[in-house]
Amino acid sequence: RLAVAAGRRLDDAQPWVDGQLSGVGSGRFTVRLHAVLPPVAAAGTCLSLRVLRPATQDLAALAVAGAITPEAARLLADVITARLAFLVSGGTGAGKTTLLSAALGAVAPHERIVCVEDAPELAPPHPHLVRLVARTANVEGVGEITVRQLVRQALRMRPDRIVVGEVRGAEVVDLLAALNTGHDGGAGTVHANSPEEVPARLEALAALGGLDRAALHSQLAAAVQVLLHVSRGGDGRRRLSEIALLHRDDTGRVSALPAWHVDRGEQRGYQPLLQVIRDRCGR
């Protein structure tokens, strides 16, 4: 019944399903559904449900909760004011969407933000927000609307900032292209265990869209300036743990230059990041 409610098929011929249940909790939540039937699931039917609560907190609320330090909050506010493009990296459940939504809430109210998502999670406290949500194919296998298609549609909606809730496929090619066509200040999230791993992760995703390594690094260097890395500690606390500046070396490769760490404070990339901010703001 859950599979049918998600518009998907689950039977002996199709023994697994991956879908979304909308309208849960009086329409407040979306639930991601994954199920596998035996004999593929050897011990019996395996069902996984993940509740996606709208991310509505602002930076002040995250600071009160201890998820972001005052110093990091000020630096992030400067990044947003300077319209630097940024990616939020981290593992599953580390708080990437929560931080991204809070950061978008700090964008000037006159700016138009167009968010493209695989599932409706981003709900930043911002008055000029347009949300586009992808759709899976129905039981007949038709009607799919991909994130990549929606990124292209977003370009036609006069956005001041384009945001992709989660970059996990070939849509990275279209996002980077969009950010390189005059749409400064864009953002997104990506799965990675550290800021240093983000370029390699984007290489793999770009390959799905037919973009080779050299082209990816060229596009990335021009499109994205900052990485925000979130982590989840052994006590379950989620926090912004690192800020890095993306820079291109003499070989043409993009790497992450550490700028700030939650335990170690300012890093060697801190002053270069401040200089980029000053240059953008004309200071």
Could you tell me what each predicted segment is?
Residues 219, 234-283:
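NTP-binding/hydrolysis catalytic cores, primarily Walker-type P-loop NTPases
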Residues 88:
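Hydrophobic anchor at the beta1->P-loop junction of P-loop NTPases
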Residues 96:
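Conserved lysine of the Walker
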Residues 1-82:
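P-loop NTP-binding catalytic core
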Residues 54-64, 101-152, 198-201:
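P-loop NTPase switch/communication element
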Residues 117, 122-127, 154-248:
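Conserved P-loop NTPase nucleotide-binding/switch module
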Residues 93:
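Walker A (P-loop) phosphate-binding loop of P-loop NTPases
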Residues 85:
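Walker A (P-loop) ATP-phosphate-binding motif of ABC ATPase nucleotide-binding domains
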